[in-house]
Amino acid sequence: MRTMNNFLNWLFTLDHKRIGILYTLVGIWAGFLGLSFSIMIRVNFLEPYYNVISTDCYNFLITNHGILMIFFFLMPILIGGFGNFLIPLLSGLSDLNLPRLNALSFWLLVPSVIFLVTSMCLGAGVGWTFYPPLSSSLFSGSKGVDFLMFSLHLAGVSSIFSSINFICTLYSVFSVNLASRSSVILWTYLFTSILLLTTLPVLAAAITMLLFDRNFGSAFFDPLGGGDPVLFQHMFWFFGHPEVYVLILPGFGMVSHACLNMGCAPDVFGFYGLVFASFSIVCLGSVVWAHHMFTVGLDVKTAVFFSSVTMVIGVPTGIKVFTWLYMLLNSNVNKSDPIFLWVVSFIVLFTFGGVTGIVLSACVLDSVLHDTWFVVAHFHYVMSLGSYISIVIMFIWWWPLITGVSLNKYLLQCQCLVSNIGFNMCFFPMHYFGLCGLPRRVCMYESSFSWINMICTVGSFISIFSGCFFVFILWESLVSRHVALGSFGAASVVTNMILSPIAYHNNFFTHYLSVNYSYGVYHIYWKNNVYIGTWT
């Protein structure tokens, strides 16, 4: 009976912490499923002209690998998981403003996953970008493509509801004092929510038009009926490129927060620089979508505009990187600490991926490299490594607050070393592939590349081992019960006042709280208005 009650409590919970944990569990499951697909892809490249799996199955794998990793691994953990958990705590609230909408957002994700698994079974090999005419009924008649569209529709509605909830909650926080130097994490989640709310309806419209083309005889993207398939690319990438920043902005906030605490500083160095750099990235990132389309025949003026603005995005990103380096330079933290190693790994790998992005932003070079493995290497360094390392940093940082136990330092050091070796062995040689002209999305290749493909495959196995190793470290901490003695750092942040593990459905505050990093003064009240203490 107690087990059933606990199950029902989790099933019908409105608590932001439990919903965040549910999001995270779904994300971990999807992440390992996507990893298994990536291993099958890499195994297929062990032999140059012999396919371990059929070509149709290969198309199914690359389609579902991309969609799983982006929509069901990175977004649920970074936004649904840690966003749900951290926004109320860092804002001084007991929950999000719309808890029922929060629960609905999660439970829309479950049928979305079911539809995606159904599409896998029925077959949907249209690529994660599902461009027409390949995704039209003429060339992809399988009903699996329709289930894939429905899956993305539900995932999009879930994200829109979460974004509305986050914006309402953060508005109630910032409306008290807009000039408050609140946590950078809150600002990055606000910008992330604005990006999602702006771009997801455009993707939903594109998917709806494609469904009508496939099932009701319309011709939005069919040239024979007066449609334009390039229109779909514009609509898709109007969402697709800001999605990159949706996945990396929470990581920017977390790295800024970690650097602040490791420096034991009373305030973030260059706070307004970080916030306005994030805002600049949001604004610029929303108007550069066509740099994914340099090979479709854009006119010269359009290509030059999108190429130039893409290069400008490197400026606010550089402001962030140098701000983090300055804070790390002035920190007294042990340089062998796992959190320090991971933050440095994030800065180095993400910066390297950004530099290759500057290379691709030149429309002349992109025309040559667009359909090669160079692009695969670029977006894996930025999205896969940047966002994945953000998740690892968040787990290491907030695990004591969530569970009350700390992770094994020496195991984390080993895991960081193994991960970086695996990442770079897997993805760095892909730049060489691209410069040699090896085409992506093709499962056969010239035999002269077999030795370096072997290196990539070994690196992918090491990367998967590191992921499993990290889950083992989480499990080991729960079994060994290494009780956390305190939070990371000594900066004046409100989470340092909360007991760990944090209680279920505590009403911490009875009024909206303006959290000010500049002075670090917090007045904490329980629900019955009994004064607890002041942090100065």
Residue ranges and their predicted role:
Residues 1-536:
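Membrane-embedded and interfacial regions of multi-pass energy-transducing membrane proteins
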